[in-house]
């Protein structure tokens, strides 16, 4: 799948991530110019978790993000619908579960916090995914969505879009096992809702106290919310 589409085929998306799994972590670090580590730390900080918490890390991929979250002392589980990605992270000592974000294999209200980083764009129905995250979260629990977004500075936004559509695919050809996946990445970012629109959608999915802030000039946005008690 090389074109971004709001009608994503789950099998195609899972297969695409299976294909990039082996070099996924290295590719992310190279293409983000090392910012991926900063984004993971900021996500953990925004989630406000501690040793008593149970945390779901959705679209966790190779579980790099789950390991970062587990440094808080919380019990953290990595979930992803790409079996290849989970297998690539087999050496990381955190629980792993294969599952679809729109039909999570968990009971109601079991997690104190749920997070998804750079995965909501790839969910076939991301609004349904947001509702599922609310279902498995305890009343008063927390949500943090870390996702690519829209730079707010017009000049920076123009430069960034040029990077997405030209430089990023070229760099991916050099370091990725499936460069076509990064063409999809670039196009899916351009098709994604703005920060304000995503905040509205999170609220409509049953979350309250929705707020967001930009990282790296708006290349990434952190949206945080709470499940009503």
Curated annotation (Swiss-Prot):
Which reaction is recorded as catalysed by this protein? a 2-demethylmenaquinol + S-adenosyl-L-methionine = a menaquinol + S-adenosyl-L-homocysteine + H(+)
Report the superkingdom from the record: Bacteria
What metabolic or biological pathway is this protein involved in?
Answer: Quinol/quinone metabolism; menaquinone biosynthesis; menaquinol from 1,4-dihydroxy-2-naphthoate: step 2/2
GO MF, one annotated term:
demethylmenaquinone methyltransferase activity
Any one GO BP annotation for this protein: methylation
Which SUPFAM superfamilies did the record assign?
S-adenosyl-L-methionine-dependent methyltransferases
Query: What does the record give as EC number?
Result: 2.1.1.163
Keyword Signal annotated? no
Sorted alphabetically, which keywords does the UniProt record give? Menaquinone biosynthesis, Methyltransferase, S-adenosyl-L-methionine, Transferase
Say yes or no: keyword Methyltransferase present. yes
* Enzyme class, first EC level, given as a word: transferase
Q: Which residues bind S-adenosyl-L-methionine?
A: 62, 80, 100-101, 117
Give the family per the record. Answer: Belongs to the class I-like SAM-binding methyltransferase superfamily. MenG/UbiE family.
* Function according to Swiss-Prot or TrEMBL: Methyltransferase required for the conversion of demethylmenaquinol (DMKH2) to menaquinol (MKH2).
- Name of the protein: Demethylmenaquinone methyltransferase
Organism, scientific name: Mycolicibacterium smegmatis (strain ATCC 700084 / mc(2)155)
Task: Name the gene for this chain.
Answer: menG
């Amino acid at each position: 799948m090389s074109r971004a589409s709001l009608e994503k085929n789950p099998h195609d998306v899972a297969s695409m991530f299976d294909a990039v799994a082996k070099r996924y972590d290295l590719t992310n670090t190279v293409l983000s110019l090392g910012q991926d580590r900063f984004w993971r730390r900021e996500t953990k900080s925004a989630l406000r978790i501690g040793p008593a918490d149970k945390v779901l890390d959705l679209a966790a991929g190779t579980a790099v993000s789950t390991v970062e979250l587990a440094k808080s002392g919380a019990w953290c589980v990595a979930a992803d619908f790409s079996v290849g990605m989970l297998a690539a992270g087999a050496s990381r000592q955190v629980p792993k579960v294969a599952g679809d974000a729109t039909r999570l294999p968990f009971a109601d209200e079991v997690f104190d916090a749920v997070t998804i980083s750079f995965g909501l764009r790839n969910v076939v129905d991301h609004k349904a995914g947001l509702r599922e995250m609310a279902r498995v979260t305890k009343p008063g629990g927390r949500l943090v969505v870390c996702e690519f977004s829209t730079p707010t500075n017009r000049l920076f936004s123009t430069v960034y879009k040029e990077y997405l559509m030209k430089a990023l695919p070229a760099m991916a050809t050099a370091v990725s096992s499936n460069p076509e996946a990064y063409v999809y990445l670039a196009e899916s970012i351009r098709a994604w809702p703005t920060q304000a629109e995503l905040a509205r959608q999170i609220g409509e999915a049953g979350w309250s106290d929705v707020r967001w802030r930009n990282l790296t000039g708006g290349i990434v946005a952190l949206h945080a919310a709470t499940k009503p008690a």
